[in-house]
Amino acid sequence: MGSNIDKTLNALSQGFVSSCQPVDDGPMDKPEIVAAMAMASVEGGAIGLRIEGIDNLKAVRPHVSVPIIGIIKRDLDDSEVRITPYIEDVIALKEAGADIIAIDATHRPRPVPVEELVKKIQSLGCLVMADSSTYEEGMFCHGLGVEIIGTTLSGYTTPVTPKEPDFPFIQQLANQGCFVMAEGRFNSPQLAREAIEAGASCVTVGSAITRIEHICGWFKSEVELGKKNMVKDIA
């Protein structure tokens, strides 16, 4: 297991991860399209993938050899935890071909304790990624032996989500010797570079690569702003 961990972490530390998660129920939300996104991402230079859902993971796995971070998202009635909340999710992700399994690592009410999920994932021979929202959560998981600490949920457990990524969070974790996966609002190449400069071992990029609806929305907003500015200048 030790050599497998080193091999996977070394691979991830060479670049960035493409999170191939289309908008739910959108026109791109089909396993065959997710697989195409994944293959195109690898051809473009991604050294890892983050894939949500068993059907999508099964569609992607035969076509790529790079490490895959697998997750299952659920909307629970009694918990705000969405990412891989159950033991059965962990087992299904392993069977579908995930190398790394990411879990919600926040200190919120949850159906299964973080410790149990971590233990199960590692017993199956997979690495764990802790999707954290705070330094305390990240360090708790680091103390459990979690291999990858992600900044994934920073800004998403509070009333207001910042526009910029959480660079201080990256720096704090890196200073403690964590393998840091920067994730969350890294929507430009420059921000991805700044994450590495802040101490991240790797960066996960999602919407800016694989969510066409979001990308078009960004351009739409800027073009509309430009039109308004032109009107002001004329006035």
UniProtKB/Swiss-Prot annotation:
Listed GO CC annotations: cytosol
SUPFAM superfamilies, per database record: Ribulose-phoshate binding barrel
Gene3D superfamilies in alphabetical order: Aldolase class I
Substrates-to-products reaction catalysed: an N-acyl-D-glucosamine 6-phosphate = an N-acyl-D-mannosamine 6-phosphate
GO MF annotation list: N-acylglucosamine-6-phosphate 2-epimerase activity
Keywords linked to the UniProt accession: Carbohydrate metabolism, Isomerase
Pathway listed: Amino-sugar metabolism; N-acetylneuraminate degradation; D-fructose 6-phosphate from N-acetylneuraminate: step 3/5
Keyword NAD: no
GO annotation terms (biological process): carbohydrate metabolic process; N-acetylmannosamine catabolic process; N-acetylneuraminate catabolic process
Pfam families: NanE (PF04131)
Tagged with keyword Isomerase: yes
Function: Converts N-acetylmannosamine-6-phosphate (ManNAc-6-P) to N-acetylglucosamine-6-phosphate (GlcNAc-6-P).
PANTHER family in UniProt: N-ACETYLMANNOSAMINE-6-PHOSPHATE 2-EPIMERASE-RELATED
Protein name: Putative N-acetylmannosamine-6-phosphate 2-epimerase
Biological source species: Aliivibrio fischeri (strain ATCC 700601 / ES114)
